[in-house]
Structures are given as structure tokens and as C-alpha cells.
């Protein structure tokens, strides 16, 4: 533009140009958005992929100290306008804990793969450790519009000496078990097999990752709902949806395996399924029982965890 060829930074795709938050124009643009949201009585903002928001030469430009300062700055400006700040970032688990102390809420992205690990391995060691250290100011999820983030439980991608919640060989076994449970469907949608922006996510619906086992699916949802935080259920998860291979083949976008377009008739049919009815009952239980405003505790007996309020 301006009759000149200029370089722009696009972390993800050419359709998403990064904002220079160091410039007056870039920062002013962000503040104008916060002004408009505050004036519209919005209660919270979600900073998507904010881990890539700060740039500094000779660094990874991901979750560097400058990123934390940017997050704190946006959080402070949001608070002035009555906005809570929710952070979306897939990263090494200790960085998630650090971020949580600086903002209003974070996503608990470690929980989905940890629950799969517990189901597949029969061990609750890693899950129990996470329960003891995880931030309580979390939005809990099992599934989102993206894949299952195994990066959130593994060792630090930039420093392998920093161990994860689950040893890397066990993370590899977790991924292979998901591929086996989906009869290879998730393998077709993950990594270099399809057009993926993130090679550290396994693309599959959560229900399919569990081999479409109703009991396992409801058990993982129950744990999600019983842990401190605000539970969020993705629309495909609300339908206990299986992988959409037709959409994947049509678009060759890995994440589309978990982005089925439901017709009204399909929704009506799915609402009659016992697993979906049980999930809806569980949602109502979580939303209406006053006990969840109390104090959380848990007990362990062998490989059994009992969560209580």
C-alpha cells in the first residue's frame, strides 16, 4: 500500500496480520476496541493466541517476558472499562500457572489430555498433581474449535529439560491411543496430514478420542464440572459428536473434523440419545446446585479420586 511493498507479520495465515503493539497506532487500535466493548457493557474479553502478541529480536516471540507485560497492560486497561480478561494460550503448564496470577481467568487446557491419559493408563498420578497446582480461576474445557492440546501436558517445547505433567513417551502413547480409538481418523486430520497451523494438537472430537464410549465420556465431563472453575462445553461436545470425515475430506483442514454443521433435524435426533440426555442433566446439576459455591476437596484411594464440594 502507499505505492510501496511492505513487510507484514502474519503468525498464522495471510488473512491474519499481527498488530504492532509497540507502536502508538497499534496500541491505539487495541484501546479503541476496548473502549467500544466497555461502552457496549460487555463483561469480559478473550485474548486469543495472545502468546504471540509481543515481538522481540533474537527470541522465540512466544510467551517471552515482554508477552507477560503486554498481558498485564491489557488486563489493567480492561479493568478500567469494567472488563474481565480471559487468556487463551496453549503453552507449558507452569507458564499457564504464571499467567493465571496476572489475569482474571485462563483456560484449563491441560485438563482434556490429562483426563484422556487417566482413562487410557488407569493412573491418576498426573491428574492428582494437576488438581493440586492448577489455577482455580479457570474456564474448564474438554473440547474447543481447535484440537486436543497435548503441548499443555508435555515438556517445554523450548527447553526439554523442563519436564511436563506427563513424561513425553507417555504423551506419545496418548496420541497413538487416540489414533487407535478413532480408527486412524484423527491421524488423517493431525500434523502434516492436513492443513494445520499447530502441529502440537490432535484433531478429533473428544467423544471420538474416547472411542465413542458413553461412560468414559460422561465420566470425563463429570470431572470437568466438579473441578473449580467455569465449565464450558463446545457445541460438538454438547451433541457427543463423532468425527466429521466428510467435512475433513472436503476441506482438507484438520480442525474441521471437529466442526460439524448440524441441521435442525440432527440436533433433534441427538437430543434423544441417552448420552446427550445424561450430559444435559449433568449440566443442569452443575448449574443449579448451591454446593458448587462452596469449598472444593478431594480424596484418593488407590487409583480412585473422589471430588467433593
Protein language model annotation of sequence segments:
Residues 1-309:
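Active-site and adjacent substrate-binding regions of carbohydrate-active enzymes
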Amino acid at each position: 500500500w502507499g505505492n510501496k511493498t511492505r513487510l507484514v507479520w502474519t503468525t498464522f495465515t495471510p488473512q491474519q496480520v499481527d498488530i504492532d503493539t509497540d507502536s502508538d497506532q497499534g496500541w491505539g487500535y487495541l484501546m479503541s476496541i476496548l473502549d467500544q466493548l466497555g461502552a457496549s457493557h460487555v463483561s469480559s474479553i478473550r485474548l486469543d493466541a495472545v502468546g504471540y502478541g509481543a515481538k522481540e529480536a533474537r527470541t522465540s516471540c512466544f510467551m517471552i517476558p515482554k508477552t507477560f507485560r503486554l498481558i498485564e497492560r491489557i488486563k489493567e486497561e480492561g479493568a478500567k472499562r469494567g472488563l474481565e480478561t480471559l487468556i487463551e494460550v496453549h503453552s507449558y503448564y507452569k507458564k499457564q500457572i504464571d499467567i493465571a496470577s496476572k489475569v482474571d481467568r485462563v483456560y484449563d487446557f491441560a485438563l482434556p489430555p490429562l483426563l484422556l491419559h487417566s482413562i487410557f493408563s488407569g493412573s491418576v498420578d498426573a491428574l492428582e498433581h494437576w488438581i493440586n497446582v492448577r489455577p482455580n480461576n479457570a474456564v474448564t474445557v474438554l473440547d474447543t474449535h481447535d484440537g486436543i492440546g497435548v503441548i499443555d501436558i508435555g515438556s517445554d517445547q523450548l527447553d526439554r529439560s523442563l519436564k511436563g505433567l506427563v513424561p513425553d513417551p507417555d504423551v506419545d502413547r496418548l496420541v497413538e491411543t487416540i489414533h487407535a480409538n478413532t480408527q486412524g481418523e484423527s491421524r488423517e486430520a493431525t500434523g502434516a496430514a492436513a492443513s494445520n497451523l499447530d502441529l502440537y494438537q490432535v484433531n478429533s472430537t473428544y467423544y471420538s478420542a474416547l472411542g465413542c464410549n458413553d461412560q468414559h465420556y460422561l465420566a470425563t465431563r463429570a470431572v470437568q464440572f466438579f473441578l473449580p472453575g467455569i465449565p464450558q462445553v463446545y457445541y460438538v461436545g454438547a451433541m457427543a459428536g463423532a468425527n466429521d470425515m466428510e467435512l475433513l475430506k472436503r476441506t482438507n483442514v484438520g480442525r474441521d473434523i471437529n466442526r460439524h454443521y448440524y441441521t435442525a433435524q440432527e440436533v433433534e435426533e441427538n437430543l434423544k440419545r441417552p448420552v446427550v440426555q445424561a450430559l444435559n442433566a449433568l449440566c443442569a446439576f452443575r448449574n443449579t446446585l448451591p454446593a458448587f459455591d462452596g469449598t472444593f476437596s478431594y480424596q484418593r484411594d488407590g487409583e480412585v479420586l473422589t471430588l467433593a464440594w
